[in-house]
């Protein structure tokens, strides 16, 4: 997007406009997503409790009930308890919402639809989502209420404890993929359903369930919602909030639910990739125009959204099915079960990846082809070479050299390539058995 704006305005202004457009789009995604998820939770709760749920506002299914509730909250009076810290009391809900919102900056909705592609996107999301607890603590501290303070203290202890096993679970797919870039991890899982990392080995399968348990606790959802236990703390840390500020806490909660579900979809369930292989939309973009590329990204986004909504629905189902735990039981689940299991899964994934890099399916994973994605003129050139080779047209020495150079670049990126080198694949001027010039240049650079 910055490249598009740079055609008409200076470079610094182009990047600023691109950042503003991304912020506006992401804010609407979080806000609209929260409205949809609130309506969905009401319908799920009604279904589990043998009720109908919203049925009056917006037709038979109550589509506009959440919007009506939002308008009601906007028109409500903003109250503040006597003795509260005015600055911190007003600031707390915005801190929680901003922390939840920032997680979407590095979350890819499709192969080409991501605000910022970060090399450490996994840990960026975990770091910014960990900041949400500061808003909860400030809300409890500044409300001048013992119920709010108890809720904030519970949330702090719970989030800090569950981030340890959750971080270890996230490292397992990162270790297998060899990258912390979420886009690269998603590209690695292209192809059939068996290429998804959850089916790589038994350890990743168990790791997903430990991750999802810890993620449910980190976003303060039942049965781990001790910070807002109605039977003990009235309403928890947001007891004294009303109106629009109260709604910011709920938008942050549902936004975090979608974010952790999206992270699980990328790390374990193929991200935007479907269960069946589809065409290489990047190659179609260069051969048939950008319309096919946009169509591919849109289909990938639909796959990603379906997986995220499935994860959010599972959290809602757990809330209305399982009873709330006591605070000592919540900490026991973390320290006695989740943390040791996550540590064992991490060690098991290390050993499995070292001795059996093919994974549980037995299929060789072409890391070099998946992690290396050519673009621009190089992608078009390699596409033409593939078409010529598939049609039986013999490739010249220059064509084979071009293909071998691209594979060498993929090896330098940390990928694997077990294809043997022959005399025709060497660059011109190299001696038999000597390292290519790119290898010598890389060694001298280091």
List where the protein language model places each region:
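Selective transmembrane helix interface/packing segments
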Residues: 1-389, 393-422, 426-446
């Amino acid at each position: 997007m910055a490249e598009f704006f740079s055609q008409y305005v200076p470079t610094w202004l182009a990047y600023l406009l691109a950042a503003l457009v991304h912020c506006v789009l992401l804010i609407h995604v979080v806000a609209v997503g929260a409205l949809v998820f609130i309506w969905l939770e009401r319908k799920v709760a009604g279904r589990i409790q043998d009720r109908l749920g919203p049925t009056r506002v917006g037709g038979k299914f109550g589509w506009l009930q959440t919007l009506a509730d939002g308008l009601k909250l906007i028109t409500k009076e903003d109250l503040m308890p006597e003795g509260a810290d005015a600055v911190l009391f007003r600031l707390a809900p915005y801190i929680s919402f901003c922390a939840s919102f920032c997680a979407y900056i590095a979350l890819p909705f499709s192969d080409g639809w991501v605000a910022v592609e970060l090399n450490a996107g996994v840990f960026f999301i975990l770091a910014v989502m960990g900041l949400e607890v500061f808003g909860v603590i400030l809300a409890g501290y500044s409300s001048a209420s013992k119920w709010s303070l108890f809720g904030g203290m519970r949330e702090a202890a719970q989030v800090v404890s569950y981030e340890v096993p959750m971080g270890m679970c996230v490292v397992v797919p990162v270790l297998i993929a060899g990258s912390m870039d979420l886009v690269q991890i998603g590209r690695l899982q292209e192809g059939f359903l068996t290429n998804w990392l959850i089916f790589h080995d038994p350890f990743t399968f168990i790791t997903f369930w430990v991750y999802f348990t810890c993620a449910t606790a980190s976003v303060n959802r039942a049965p781990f919602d001790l910070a807002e236990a109605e039977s003990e703390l009235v309403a928890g840390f947001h007891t004294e909030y009303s109106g629009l500020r109260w709604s910011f806490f709920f938008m942050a909660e549902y936004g975090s639910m979608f974010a952790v579900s999206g992270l699980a979809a990328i790390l374990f369930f193929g991200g935007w990739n479907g269960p069946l292989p589809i065409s290489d939309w990047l190659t179609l973009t260069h051969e048939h125009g950008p319309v096919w590329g946009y169509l591919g990204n849109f289909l990938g986004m639909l796959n990603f959204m379906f997986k995220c909504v499935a994860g959010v629905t599972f959290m809602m189902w757990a809330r209305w099915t399982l009873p709330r735990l006591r605070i000592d039981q919540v900490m026991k689940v973390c320290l006695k079960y989740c943390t040791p299991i996550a540590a064992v899964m991490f060690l098991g994934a290390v050993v499995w990846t070292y001795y059996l890099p093919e994974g549980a399916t037995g299929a060789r994973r072409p890391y070099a082809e998946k992690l290396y994605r050519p673009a621009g003129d190089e992608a078009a050139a390699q596409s033409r070479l593939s078409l010529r080779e598939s049609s039986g047209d013999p490739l010249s020495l220059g064509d084979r050299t071009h293909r071998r150079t691209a594979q060498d670049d993929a090896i330098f990126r940390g990928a694997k390539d077990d294809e043997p080198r022959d005399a025709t694949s060497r660059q011109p001027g190299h001696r038999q058995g000597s390292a290519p010039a790119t290898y010598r240049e890389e060694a001298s650079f280091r």
